[in-house]
Every structure is written in C-alpha cells, then in structure tokens.
Amino acid sequence: MSQDLNSGRIVVLAGPSAVGKSTVVRRLRTDVPDLFFSVSMTTRDPRPGEVDGEDYIYVTREQFEQNIAADKMLEWAEIHGGLQLSGTPREPIEKALAESRPVLVEVDLEGARNVKKMLPQVQTVFLAPPSWEELVDRLTGRGTETQDVIERRLQTAKVEMASQSEFDHVVVNDDVDKAVAAISEILR
C-alpha cells in the first residue's frame, strides 16, 4: 500500500441511487477549495448530460477487468445484482494526497466498506433520503432506467438503508444546501 494513501483527508460518500449524490458532489466540487473528486470507473452506460471523465470514466467490462488485474483499482465491486462493475482508480487519489488536497470518493456500500477496511482513517458519510417514499419518487421520476433496473436499484437501496449505522456520519439530503454544508465541514 502506498504511504500516500495513509495520509491526508479522505471522505467516502455513499448512499442509495437517486438520493442526490451527484447533485451534492457537483456543489462540493465548486464550494470546497482544492477538493479532489475521485471520478469512479463504471461499465454502465452514461445518462443524458453525463460527461466521460468528469461524471464517471466509462469503460467496457473487458477494460475494467484489465484495470483490476493490473492492480489499478483502490476498490471495485459488481453492483445491482451484476448489472455493472464500478470502482475507484488508485493513482489519481495517491497524486491528490501527495499534493495535500482533501479527497472525496463517491462509492456504493461495498466500496465504502472496502475503502474503510483498507484505510481505517477515512471518514465515511451516508447520504440518506428524507424518507423511503421520497427515494422511490426520485428514482422512478428520473425516467432514465427500465422498470427492471428500477426494481434492482430499489432492492440495493433497501440493503444500503439498513447499513447506514456502519458509517461515521449520516447526512439526510432533504435540503441540498444543508447537506453540502455538513459534508464540507467533514472535509475540513
């Protein structure tokens, strides 16, 4: 393990699909000076408006598996019942920490567990919806997924919601400004 990963401030953000992680991350990237946001690598297709290399690094399953084999991933997981692979590239985080920048890593539940296991000093944040009903409304209201995908994401969300006590911090996203302020404090 690189010494760079054992020093510096790393905040790991997780939460269910449609809880507003992307919105909160976008705001944090503008509001927190010097913040390094670790762009996750994924095998899922981009949603409308998402930019490769900015929102996610979009790759094929084969490319993702090559990165795993070459030990280029800090963590990775097969998520939503095998629907996609998603993970965190290692090198950009090492570089940001070497530059003494705070690091924000957005991952799923397994990713948060894996990073915490490898780097116990990280602060984990669970971004929670105001209610289950609100989460279902947000997910179905996006209009970007099929009913089958929505059902899988809701199944995953049930497991994630039941696991929030594992996190160092729980931030309820009923107001984006308040959620951003709370996570900004944790990053300081």
Swiss-Prot record:
Residues 8-188 form the Guanylate kinase-like domain. Transmembrane segments: none annotated. Signal peptide: none annotated. GO terms for molecular function: ATP binding; guanylate kinase activity. It comes from the Bacteria. Coiled coil: none annotated. It catalyses: GMP + ATP = GDP + ADP. ATP binds at residues 15-22. It is an enzyme of class 2 (transferase). Its EC number is 2.7.4.8. Keywords: ATP-binding, Cytoplasm, Kinase, Nucleotide-binding, Transferase. GO terms for cellular component: cytosol. It is found in: Cytoplasm. Pfam families: Guanylate_kin (PF00625). CDD domains: GMPK (cd00071). Belongs to the guanylate kinase family. HAMAP family: Guanylate_kinase (MF_00328). Essential for recycling GMP and indirectly, cGMP. This is Guanylate kinase. It comes from Corynebacterium jeikeium (strain K411).
